[in-house]
Amino acid sequence: MSDSFCPDCKKHTEVAFDHSAGDTVCTECGLVLEAHSVDETSEWRTFANESSDNDPVRVGGPTNPLLTDGGLSTVIAKPNGAQGEFLSSSLGRWQNRGSNPDRSLILAFRTIANMADRLGLVATIKDRANEIYKKVEDLKSIRGRNQDAILAACLYIACRQEDRPRTVKEICSVANGATKKEIGRAKEFIVKQLEVEMGQSMEMGTIHAGDFLRRFCSTLGMNNQAVKAAQEAVQRSEELDIRRSPISIAAAVIYMITQLSDDKKPLKDISLATGVAEGTIRNSYKDLYPYASRLIPNTYAKEEDLKNLCTP
């Protein structure tokens, strides 16, 4: 339910949606506020085909404003039976011969959706990545470039812009063979192209160590007390002049916190969970070590407990 202004009640009230009739109804007085509205989302009901074991839906997906026809094109089905198969295959050939300017876009959007699903990303990030790709594709400047790297870079930029950043290594793990270097180059290319087109710098969003911390801690199976201590330590680290990448700082803080825990984590495991090299974690830890008493909350470890930390 949601709220809407009811002219009879003279106030905002909760409204109910009658999907079968397309009506929006006030729950307090029963007034129909809107009638015969069109639901453009995908239909959830299915209707079984009596002649087969399939259970197809009657309609396709929701409209997509990035496609020429809104994604509402007609698809020729293939019925059972010898005569039907001959007819449908002939029609299908004619349909495939017809020009579809959105075919490459549909394939690109499908690839982006698959990558996003594998990373557990929300729909808003998928939509933003689709928008970025559509803008770049319209500029006709990506022909001849590594398509997998371009799509992965669009997803990386979308994560940054939606304040849900992922590391390049995480994006690379679902990028269908594109390397970190290729994705990095594609990202720089896309940003440059769009900045030239817009005539202004492209907002990418600022990365903080805390953006990655909870996900890394979850991967390592850290308890809630250790996670909270790590989050507070990361926040305090922003007050210091530590010239390391946010990902490296997050990894070093985890290394520091787990040393003071009963459930210690080997440096190798932290490296695998964060994607940061062991040597880089050691160097970042070396920079953080002198500030351990300022970083680690007293509720997690006392001053004398800090002596248990490894000397870098």
Curated annotation (Swiss-Prot):
Location of this chain's protein in the cell: Nucleus
* Functional note: General factor that plays a major role in the activation of eukaryotic genes transcribed by RNA polymerase II.
Quote the cellular component terms of the Gene Ontology held in the record. Answer: nucleus; transcription preinitiation complex
Q: Quick one: where is this thing mainly located?
A: nucleus
Zn finger (TFIIB-type) location: 2-34
Organism whose genome encodes this protein: Oryza sativa subsp. japonica
InterPro entries assigned: Cyclin-like_dom, Cyclin-like_sf, TFIIB, TFIIB_CS, TFIIB_cyclin, Znf_TFIIB
Per the similarity annotation, which family is this?
Answer: Belongs to the TFIIB family.
The protein's name is Transcription initiation factor IIB
**sequence repeats located where?**
115-192, 216-290
GO terms for biological process, alphabetical: DNA-templated transcription initiation; transcription preinitiation complex assembly
Assembly notes: Associates with TFIID-IIA (DA complex) to form TFIID-IIA-IIB (DAB-complex) which is then recognized by polymerase II. Interacts with TBP2.
Alphabetic keyword roster: Metal-binding, Nucleus, Repeat, Transcription, Transcription regulation, Zinc, Zinc-finger
Give a yes or no for keyword tRNA processing in this entry: no
Recorded hits in Pfam families, A to Z, give: TFIIB, Zn_Ribbon_TF
Q: Which GO terms describe its molecular function?
A: RNA polymerase II general transcription initiation factor activity; TBP-class protein binding; zinc ion binding
Is DNA repair found in the keyword set?
Answer: no
Residues binding Zn(2+)? 6, 9, 26, 29
